[in-house]
Design a protein with these regions (language model features):
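Accessory nucleic-acid engagement/destabilization modules that flank
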Residues: 2-233
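C-terminal helicase lobe and adjacent C-terminal extensions/tails of nucleic-acid helicase motors
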Residues: 125, 439, 491-494, 498-504, ...
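Conserved SF1/SF2 helicase motif Ia
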Residues: 282-309, 319-323, 422-423
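Walker A/P-loop
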Residues: 261-283
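Conserved Walker A/P-loop ATP-binding site and its immediately adjacent core
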Residues: 293-316, 331-334, 434-438, 510
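Post-DEXD/H (motif II) to motif III coupling segment of the RecA-like Helicase ATP-binding lobe
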Residues: 387-396, 402-467
Length: 709
């Protein structure tokens, strides 16, 4: 028996009501699409199918029954004169409306109308559902006392009565469960909203016309599978050496000794020690045990994310039991990768045409590598941040170079890491140069237990803190030298490159790198000299990066043995990029970033046989002589961009008298010395601190660079 609806009461002061079946929700190929009832039913059915497909997985725990109500009711605001006027006129069907003049929008769109309608329908007793319904287009609305159903563009009492009749009909025909939102933790509300947005988008992709039947389970499942939103099958019985083609070192063995779903790992280990493989090894074990549904690898720059992307695809080919499994590259310019990736014989790309080719949807892919800002947008007030939160739910989230972010980004990361645990994620943080205070904050601890070991693996197992013991690693001495001006070392650098050494010269700004490159090529045109920075056009930059990272990478031995070279770069080669140099020249930088640069020296022992006999593991730091004078530092404080003069001066103080660094043993004591002496640096003017504002130390993060270059 069809549900019998009571007659509507029209008010001549408001637009006349349309019949419910004529209230359109969508257009289709330039003509009318399905009505509001069909779309609402389809959205709820799509949500239920998603929940059924993901049942038994980590993400499946977050398809809350209460979200069925929001999926069914989210577009009830489209039953309003203002929305129907808009869609009918857009389809050139205004003559079918029972009014003649266009209706001005007052309420703020159909999402706000949905919130106003539900607020009245539930007698102001379900604020979370109302807020979620109003936010399904990515913007959260807070209702005010002036918001009510009597606004003319909402149609008054007659249209509200029709909307409430539709709500009752959907409740009965969908058999919506008796449940509320009060039992759902506040931090999980965003991922609940994200699941509704996903169901809405998928149901909107169905080609439903005005007379189409309701979609059945076969259509719903095919839509989800076509989008690629299904759990992946992980191969079992694969060892670490099967995946990475080498046996795990002691640090990696320690990481794999304790696999804790939902924990926070902070892995501090030397540059080039295999932290990436350790993190991926943990991720594999969690996915194999069905304690994680995917992973997102977040890095500070586009270049580093692109290099990890290649390694992640190699990892997936070994671990995922599917033909050609691939990750998605996710950063501000990844559209170019999507467009060019793996074209077929007709020049088309399957990846480019995938459902995930959208910055808002890309994180929904089970496996991704990208910049950290893509994950941080789950925390900030941007459109559809809830979908990003839901996309991360249940995954392993690996954040590399966790030390490298500024104070603002660091505070967002601290908040994100805390929420990720509530979203069923396991978080793995990687760094070679993390301060103890930063470790405490990121690990979500009030106090950090005393432990000065290096390497150090901290595990926060839902509040239970453990340090996983790691044997002391092999150490290497690095010769240090400070040069006041680049003119003092040009001849030496050119001579050493001429003798076959691979020289890496890192500057702090693009302008400095360009100038050094210009001068070196003028002095030694016969030498192969390269330049990498973030201002190259994307196609040129990609070509340069691929060439040099292959040449100076783990497998570049044959080519590098042919002749020496000089590569001039900015911080894009500072971290998470696998390049190996015989000699490093670096402009002075904060101590932790200098260590990252030193990590490019003699990175692979397998290349030692092709190094020139005279090569020495050496770093030359370019630092002006006047750094010893606080007054001059104060005057020149803006010349250290993008870094604070304070941290440059502290770095100079700890390195100026060092002739040798023992890596990695010296990393922690040197960093501690660099951040411990705030009162040790004052200008000659009382009450002023050199290069910094205020009377308290700067944040633990000292780099002012953006996260994405």
């Amino acid at each position: 028996m069809p549900l019998r609806l009571p007659p509507r009461v029209e008010n001549p002061d408001y637009p006349k009501c349309l019949a419910p079946e004529r209230c359109l929700a969508k257009s289709l190929f330039g003509g009318p699409g399905c009505n509001v009832y069909t779309h609402s039913y389809a959205a709820c059915a799509m949500f239920r199918m998603l929940r059924a497909i993901w049942q038994g997985t980590r993400k499946g725990e977050f398809f809350f029954p209460a979200a069925e109500w929001c999926a069914a009711f989210h577009d009830i605001g489209k039953i309003s004169p203002v929305f129907q006027d808009k869609i009918y006129r857009a389809l050139q069907l205004a003559q079918q409306l029972p009014w003649s003049s266009p209706i001005a929008e007052q309420s703020g769109g159909h999402a706000r109308c949905s919130a106003i309608t539900l607020d009245a329908y539930f007698d102001h007793k379900n604020p979370e559902l109302i807020r979620m319904a109003g936010a399904h287009h990515g913007i959260s609305y807070e209702l005010t006392t002036g918001d009510n159903v009597n606004q003319k563009d909402l149609g008054g009492a007659a249209w509200q009565k029709m909307r409430e009749e539709m709500l009752r009909r959907l409740t009965i025909e969908l058999d919506l469960p008796e449940c509320g939102l009060n039992s759902i933790p506040k931090e999980q509300i965003p991922i609940m909203l994200g699941s509704v947005i996903l169901a809405d988008w998928l149901s909107s992709s169905l080609d439903l016309g005005p007379d189409s039947p309701l979609p059945d389970e076969t259509i719903l499942r095919e839509t989800i599978e076509k989008a690629g939103l299904i759990p992946h099958q992980v191969r079992s019985g694969i060892s670490f050496s099967d995946i990475f083609n080498f046996e795990p070192n002691p640090m990696q063995q320690a990481c794999l000794s304790q696999i804790v779903p939902g924990g926070i790992y902070v892995i501090e280990s030397g540059m080039g020690s295999g932290k990436t493989e350790a993190a991926l090894g943990i991720a594999y074990e969690l996915m194999r045990r069905k304690q994680a549904d995917g992973l997102y690898f977040a890095l500070p720059t586009q270049l580093t994310s692109e290099k990890i992307y290649d390694r992640l695809n190699d990892f997936l080919r070994k671990t995922i039991d599917e033909p050609d499994p691939r990750a998605i590259l996710i950063h501000g310019d990844s559209w170019l990768e999507w467009t060019l990736a793996n074209p077929d014989e007709n020049g088309n790309s399957d990846l480019a045409g995938s459902w995930f080719q959208s910055k808002k949807r890309a994180l929904m892919a089970s496996f991704g590598a990208g910049t950290v800002d893509q994950a941080l947008m789950a925390e900030v007030r941007v459109r559809h941040n809830a979908l990003r939160a839901f996309a991360l739910a249940g995954k392993v989230v690996i954040i590399d170079e966790i030390h490298s972010y500024d104070a603002y980004t660091g505070s967002l990361l601290t908040k994100l890491i805390g929420d990720l645990r509530s979203w069923g994620c396991t978080v793995i943080l990687l760094s070679a140069t993390l301060t103890s205070e930063a470790c405490r904050q990121f690990a979500q601890l009030n106090d950090l237990p005393d432990n000065s070991d290096y390497p150090r693996i901290l595990l926060n197992d839902h509040g239970k803190i453990a340090f996983i013991p790691v044997p002391a690693p092999e150490t290497h001495p690095v010769d240090l030298r400070i040069a006041g001006k680049e003119e003092d070392i040009f001849a030496e650098v050119i001579a050493r490159a001429g003798n076959g050494e691979q020289v890496l010269w890192i500057e702090n700004t693009v302008h400095q790198a360009q100038e050094i490159f210009r001068r070196l090529t003028a002095l030694a045109p016969e030498l192969e000299t390269g330049l990498i920075h973030s201002r190259f056009p994307a196609c040129i930059r990609r070509k340069q990066e691929d060439y040099w990272t292959e040449l100076l990478g783990r497998n570049g031995g044959a080519k590098r043995a042919q002749n020496g070279r000089i590569l001039v770069a900015t911080q894009v080669l500072e971290q998470s990029v696998d390049v190996d140099a015989d000699l490093l020249v670096s402009r002075i930088a904060p101590a932790d970033f200098l260590f990252q640069r030193i990590g490019r020296l003699w990175r692979h022992s397998g290349l030692n046989h092709v190094r020139p006999a005279a090569a020495a593991r050496q770093c030359i730091i370019l630092a002006p002589d006047w750094l010893s004078d606080p007054v001059q530092v104060e005057k020149q404080k803006f010349s250290f961009s993008p870094y604070s003069a304070y941290w440059i001066r502290r770095s100079w103080e700890v390195f100026q008298n060092k002739k040798t660094l023992i890596v990695p043993s010296d990393i922690r004591p040197v960093l501690s010395a660099a951040v411990s002496a705030w009162n040790g640096l004052t200008s000659t003017r009382p009450g002023r601190t050199t290069g910094c504002r205020g009377n308290s130390p700067p944040s633990q993060s000292r780099n002012d660079r953006r996260a994405v270059k």
